[in-house]
Amino acid sequence: IDMQVVGRWAEERNIGFSTFADLSQRVEVRELIRGEIARINAFLPEHARVLRFANFPKELDPDEGELTRSRKLRRGFIEERYARLIDALYAGTQEVAITVPVTYQDGRKGTLSANVAITEVERAAAGSPRGQQARAAAQGTA
């Protein structure tokens, strides 16, 4: 999630949070993201739809090797560092505890431990009434 955008969204709705990890795991934020994924899923073929997702408990950072300087994912690094989370997405669990190393802005190193919720995205087939509603809403004709 984008901390500035989602943080502002949460503040406008009086949703309290203390950290990025806290904000990313709030039920309201997970529902916001779930709704957006479901809306986009309505346009995708069934085999390409997102079925489950998890919000990272921290922003991905080039200084930690997760992104290139041009902000592209370093997929191999991500797969290794977040293997527990990726495995949990495919295993069908509802939550996974992860611990990842972090580098603070002042150069100090530490770890972030968080329980990360895994959220199911409702499967609305494009031809179903719900899928048609989602498609119409996205096109502004609902």
What residue ranges belong to the model's regions?
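AMP-binding adenylation
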Residues: 1-142
